[in-house]
From Swiss-Prot:
Family matches, as SUPFAM superfamilies: Adenine nucleotide alpha hydrolases-like (SSF52402), Argininosuccinate synthetase, C-terminal domain (SSF69864)
Record CDD domains: ASS
Protein name as it appears in the record: Argininosuccinate synthase
Gene: argG
Protein family according to the UniProt entry: Belongs to the argininosuccinate synthase family. Type 1 subfamily.
Signal sequence extent: none
Species classification: Bacteria, Bacillati, Cyanobacteriota, Cyanophyceae, Synechococcales
Length: 400
């Protein structure tokens, strides 16, 4: 008897998930494999996937357009949280995993599957994100992970697939592993496994090399409503369209490349390349607007919440009680994060050059050093005396 009768497989069309189809049937005795590919903004890349899955042995191939849901329910909360794992990575790939897990669980219920499966290896973070998210949504649903058990190298995996007529989507001489959605691309493996190796220009697709970017800067204005991006250069746009347009504008100016050594949840370090033009610019603009409208204590406390939120999402705990509690705090802080941020895009850099909001806490007549100054300078002496009292008492008590 096989490990399951009917399985819904998270499918990308890549090497591992394609090989999973014959492997589940030939090695694990699965009778029927239904593939599910989530369209999260890949666009034309998903065109041949449906037929490829069927050619590889799937009984049914599902392609679900979840791009709007992805942006609305996953990317936008990440912007409100200013999510940057280890201060750099905006979670472009990690954010997709809980949504794909949700789609898998829903498809399993709809098609009467007794298990779901994914093609994650035992060294990555995605296996945790999928397994934990699926368990949170349906603790009784079995999860199969062939690539975690089959013990094949990437070259052996490609060879196994070729035995069943599955063409390799990459050259064996340069086997990059690439994941893409509307928010950006992640690239790893191959020559990138050497942390000293400079990525070749062939690695990038969304961003221009600095040498090829325009010699004149571009200025853009981003409008936010309660922490959510709503306008680009004064034009109201749907969430997906806004990110698409901003990806093109920022990528044209070489903005959005990340090359980092990342600490994975499983305890190893990994060299990762990311391209996330729009997401990085939106987080930068959102952070700046918050500095204008939030009180100092809320802003400072939120930094710790943001770090915890980013770690939870990176580590696969999107559906955890702690993240839900942090979500509530973040949403409370966003009620007055409404306004406009102006940025200068030039030669790989996005620089905030202006911001405005009707909710602004910036008081010109309190901040100015000119004749309009209304700050009570005489009050400073008493404030300093009280503020410094603990330090003064400590010094008086312990001085030699």
């Amino acid at each position: 008897m096989g490990r399951a009768k009917r399985v819904v497989l998270a499918y990308s069309g890549g090497v591992d998930t394609s090989v999973c189809i014959p492997y589940l049937k030939q090695e694990w005795g699965v009778e029927e494999v239904i593939t599910l590919a989530a369209d999260l903004g890949q666009g034309d890349e998903l065109g041949p996937i449906r037929q490829k899955a069927l050619d590889s042995g799937a009984v049914e191939s599902l392609v679900i357009d979840a791009t709007a849901e992805f942006v609305r329910d996953y990317a936008f909360p990440a912007i409100q949280a200013n999510s940057l794992y280890e201060g750099r990575y905006p979670l472009s790939t990690a954010l997709a995993r809980p949504l794909i897990a949700k789609l898998l669980v829903e498809a399993a219920a709809k098609y009467g599957a007794d298990a779901v499966a994914h093609g994650c290896t035992g060294k990555g973070n995605d296996q945790v994100r999928f397994d934990v998210s699926i368990a949170a949504l349906n603790p009784d649903l079995k999860v199969l992970a062939p690539a975690r058990e089959w013990g094949m190298s990437r070259e052996e995996t490609i060879a196994y697939g070729e035995r069943f007529g599955i063409p390799a989507p990459v050259k064996k001489s340069s086997p990059y592993s690439i994941d893409r959605n509307l928010l950006g691309r992640s690239i790893e493996a191959g020559p990138l496994e050497d942390p000293l190796h400079e990525p070749l220009e062939e690695v990038y697709a969304l961003t221009k090399a600095i040498a090829n970017t325009p010699d004149e800067p571009a200025y853009i204005e981003l409008g936010f409503d309660q922490g959510l991006p709503v306008t680009l250069n004064g034009q109201a746009l749907a969430p997906v369209a806004l990110i698409q347009q901003l990806n093109a504008i920022a990528g044209e100016h070489g903005i959005g490349r990340i090359d980092m050594i990342e600490n994975r949840l499983v305890g190893i370090k990994s060299r990762e390349i990311y391209e996330t033009p729009a997401l990085l610019v939106l987080i930068q603009a959102h952070q700046d607007l918050e500095s204008l409208v939030l009180t100092a204590d809320v802003s400072q406390y939120k930094r710790g919440i943001e770090n915890s939120w980013s770690n939870l999402v990176y580590n696969g705990l999107w559906y955890s009680p702690l993240k839900a509690a942090l979500d509530a705090f973040i949403q409370q802080t966003q009620q007055r994060v409404t306004g406009t941020v102006r940025l200068r895009l030039f030669k790989g850099n996005a620089t905030v050059v202006g911001r405005s909001s009707e909710q602004s806490l910036y008081s010109p007549d309190m901040a100015t050093y000119g004749a309009e100054d209304r700050f009570d300078h005489k009050a400073a002496e008493g404030f300093i005396y009280v503020w410094g009292m603990p330090t003064r008492i400590w010094s008086q008590t312990h001085r030699a």
